[in-house]
């Protein structure tokens, strides 16, 4: 089932320097909660500056949903320590609040209680909040409080030069983008390995179902927790953060222009369902527009091709201008065993898997084939640890045992690991392979199995509160390592100043400004 990558691996072993200079970045979302686990109702902490303009600390959907962002980094330890400093400083500034250590929220009874993230009075800030109002009215606020980790990854120019002979200009843009699209297609085919290993949301609180009927064979504990005994990541299931109305958009990952055309089509295609919500009611705006996507960011995807945007530029226009610059992996649950929601083992695994995905052959995929890849993901998400589970290839009928496919993949990853270790010295990447490959013979080692044991004993709420309390105490005690307190204060003040400047520069009323941007 695994494509034959032996030639590409042999090439890599002859050109190890092609992997020198991989760049990465991390984003981590987490809810601010009170000591009893309920959602914090306070505004974004003043000590953290302006969520609109802060470089490292912002908010996602809700005012209480923090998001930490590391700068682009070539050094794994440095990146993780930077992320830890953001958590250390924030933990000290949250008073009695703490950061929820799980992807799935628990003590939120009704979506209406969730305050949308606020970004001030500028047109840009109000637009961001209106976009969130639209998300709430379309999908419900509860779904939007699910949190995850995003891993951003780019290969060095040396890789593309060695692999495709490119230097710069239009030809380089096309070839590099084609290489990243190959990575993305392989991710759709084989990325289910991520929830298998690292999924950590095998259970949900009953409030999440909100009385909606479900066909899933949930088991229920006395404290109202619903779980599937072999599930890995309900966050990635239809109960979690997905968007069924987007499954037939026909967006494909074969070609830059085709992909962008699909995205642009979706933001212009009217939706009957969203038109029923209305765009405005009693003088209050309910969504930016009633199209299938209000803006491009609404496209739900487990992985995204990206380029840093210039001022006023849409993500797709940035891609057209310069091609794909990096990849954003969006399938990681919060790692509940790490105070910062992600750890070194995961980052090293993702490095290996990304390199494998870019090396392995990946025939072009129609939108139908793309939908077929969802079958494997759904199996792993809902019953990934089930004995005897099999997976298929795309829309074909042949089936293969998951443990065998996983071990075959890791045979390749081990060779990539040897190459990466040869550049960096040590055996860190190979060690990660040895640790993780054991999860295929023993699913009890996976994150989902480990956290489910705790959840069955303590409930989701009890588990979240215990871990959250322990991490709060730990982070508050640890000294900062990379950033100094003065740098946090300087960025707080600078971010507030930047927000004020944006607000002062606005001359156009919001309604007129929105008419141009909606």
Swiss-Prot record:
It catalyses: L-cysteine + L-glutamate + ATP = gamma-L-glutamyl-L-cysteine + ADP + phosphate + H(+). Pathway: Sulfur metabolism; glutathione biosynthesis; glutathione from L-cysteine and L-glutamate: step 1/2. SUPFAM superfamilies: Glutamine synthetase/guanido kinase (SSF55931). Its EC number is 6.3.2.2. The keyword Nucleotide-binding applies. GO terms for biological process: glutathione biosynthetic process. Keywords: ATP-binding, Glutathione biosynthesis, Ligase, Nucleotide-binding. InterPro entries: Gln_synth/guanido_kin_cat_dom, Glu_cys_ligase, Glut_cys_ligase. Pfam families: Glu_cys_ligase. GO terms for cellular component: cytosol. GO terms for molecular function: ATP binding; glutamate-cysteine ligase activity; metal ion binding. Belongs to the glutamate--cysteine ligase type 1 family. Type 1 subfamily. This is Glutamate--cysteine ligase. The gene is gshA.
């Amino acid at each position: 089932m695994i494509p034959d990558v032996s030639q590409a691996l042999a090439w890599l072993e002859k050109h190890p320097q092609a992997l020198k200079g991989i760049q990465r970045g991390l984003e981590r979302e987490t809810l601010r909660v009170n000591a009893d686990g309920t959602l914090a109702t306070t505004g974004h902490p003043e000590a953290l500056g302006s969520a609109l303009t802060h470089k490292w600390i912002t908010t996602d959907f809700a005012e209480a949903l923090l998001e930490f962002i590391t700068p682009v980094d070539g050094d794994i330890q440095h990146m993780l320590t930077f992320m830890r400093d953001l958590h250390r400083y924030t933990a000290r500034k949250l008073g009695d609040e703490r950061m929820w250590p799980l992807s799935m929220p628990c003590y939120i009874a009704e979506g209406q209680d969730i305050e949308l993230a606020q970004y001030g009075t500028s047109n840009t800030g109000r637009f961001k909040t209106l976009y969130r109002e639209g998300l709430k009215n379309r999908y419900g606020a509860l779904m939007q409080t699910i949190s995850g980790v995003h891993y951003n990854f780019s290969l060095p120019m040396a890789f593309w030069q060695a692999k495709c002979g490119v230097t710069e200009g239009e030809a380089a843009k096309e070839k590099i983008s084609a290489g990243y699209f190959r990575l993305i297609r392989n991710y759709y085919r084989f990325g289910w390995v991520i929830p298998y290993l690292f999924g950590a949301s095998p259970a949900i609180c009953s409030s999440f179902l909100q009385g909606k009927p479900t066909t899933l064979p949930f088991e229920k504990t006395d404290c109202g927790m619903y779980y599937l005994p072999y599930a890995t990541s309900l966050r990635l299931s239809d109960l979690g953060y997905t968007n069924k109305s987007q499954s037939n958009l026909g967006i494909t990952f074969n070609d830059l222009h085709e992909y962008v055309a699909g995205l642009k089509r979706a933001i212009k295609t009217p939706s009957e369902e969203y038109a029923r919500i209305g765009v405005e009611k009693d003088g209050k705006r309910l969504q930016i527009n009633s199209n299938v996507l209000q803006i491009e960011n609404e496209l739900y995807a487990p992985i995204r091709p990206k380029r840093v945007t210039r001022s006023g530029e849409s993500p797709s226009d940035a891609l057209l201008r310069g091609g794909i610059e990096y990849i954003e992996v969006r399938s990681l649950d919060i790692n509940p065993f790490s105070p910062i929601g992600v750890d070194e083992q995961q980052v090293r695994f993702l490095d290996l898997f990304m390199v494998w995905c870019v090396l392995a052959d990946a025939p072009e995929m129609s939108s139908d084939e793309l939908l077929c890849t969802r079958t494997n993901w759904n199996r792993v998400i809902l019953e990934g640890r089930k004995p005897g589970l099999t997976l298929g290839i795309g829309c074909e009928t042949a089936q293969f045992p998951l443990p065998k496919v996983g071990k075959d993949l890791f045979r390749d990853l081990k060779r990539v690991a040897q190459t990466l270790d040869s550049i960096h010295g040590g055996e860190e990447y190979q060690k990660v392979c040895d640790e993780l490959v054991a999860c295929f013979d023993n699913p009890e080692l996976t994150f989902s199995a480990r956290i489910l044991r705790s959840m069955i004993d303590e409930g989701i709420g009890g588990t979240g509160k215990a871990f959250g309390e322990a991490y709060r105490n730990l982070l508050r005690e640890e000294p900062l390592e990379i950033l100094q307190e003065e740098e946090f204060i300087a960025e707080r003040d600078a971010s507030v100043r930047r927000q004020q400047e944006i607000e002062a520069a606005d001359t156009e009323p919001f309604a007129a400004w929105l008419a141009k941007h909606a």
